[in-house]
Amino acid sequence: MSTPLITPDLVAVDLVATDRDDATRQLIDLLYAAGRVTDADGFHADVRAREAQMATGMPGGIGLPHARSSHVTVPSLAVGKVAAGVDFGAPDGPATLVFLIAAPDAGDGDHLKILAALARRLVHESFRTALTDARSADEVADIVTREVVPS
């Protein structure tokens, strides 16, 4: 991928959200502002449709909304840290780390590779702790790039 999967402008370290839909929308707005999504409302509808199929909460305080969409220009990952937590349907409670994967409609392979690589890292408490402890968007983007993005 020539465009980085994640950059600091796609990270919200102090995300305050009322629910998962609000958290997702705020991350979509970051993608839109960065020019990675052409229609924020359209992509939001695609993410909602995917969420309606199955909850995307994972154990360990993780929300992992994702969708392929014609409104996405390049595979991207936006991250939000939500101190108060947001319910993404995980059995162990609210998510404090939210990862929004956005992939172009034609990007089946990219979407699955990103999802698989991220899921492999998220099972490790040390990875989740490093992200939780990171104080800046630069730190979060660096950790994700180092640990998730294939070299």
Which role fits each region the language model picked out?
Residues 1-151:
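Cytosolic covalent-transfer regions centered on His/Cys nucleophiles
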